[in-house]
Amino acid sequence: MSNQDIHEVLLIIADISGYTKFMVSDDVEVKHSQHIISELIHTIIRQVEIPLEVSKLEGDAVFLYAKKESDTFTWDYIRKTTGEKLIRFFDAFHNKLQELTTHRSCGCGACSNLHELSLKVVAHSGEALFYNIHDFKELSGKDVILVHRLLKNSINTDEYLLMTQQAYEDVEFPDLLATEEGKESYSHLGPVTTYVYKPESRLG
């Protein structure tokens, strides 16, 4: 292990909801399911550009980060670009979902139930330890743990953008968002103030 550095970062996870139910047992349907999920994951990744970077793929999710300090970009640019991308993830996801629905290859369970898939995105701002293991760049630390814990929450809908107060204050969105303030609590991490945006409630 070498090249250990701590950076202030925006941490983001884009996670496909309905993935477990979608990956059904029939062999043909499993293959079609994986193809569909892969297409949707690739769609999200195609939206990623510097200052956002992909840390890793985590099954049905993409773990992203943006360093808050940069020799190339101003902080104002980073926070605005991140806000634009957080919204664009939903637009791109649903455009791809519509395309797959329109051109679905068959009537199997996977192809017939595309409407059950949705996207949830969680975001937190904090610190992360960057280190290398062989050729792999890893991130760790309390804030990395927290952003993953946020995927398990009390929100009663499948599609949303959940931000901690730190992320909400750091990110600047292109339009006014209707958000709901909430509270989550996690063992060893304590209470977390959150702001939740549901895509259909966008103002502007």
Which residues make up each language-model segment?
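A generic fold-level signal
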Residues: 4-6, 57, 114-116, 139, ...
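Catalytic NTP-binding/metal-coordinating core of nucleotidyl cyclase/transferase enzymes
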Residues: 1-84, 88
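C-terminal tail/extension regions appended to the core domain(s) of diverse proteins
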Residues: 169-204
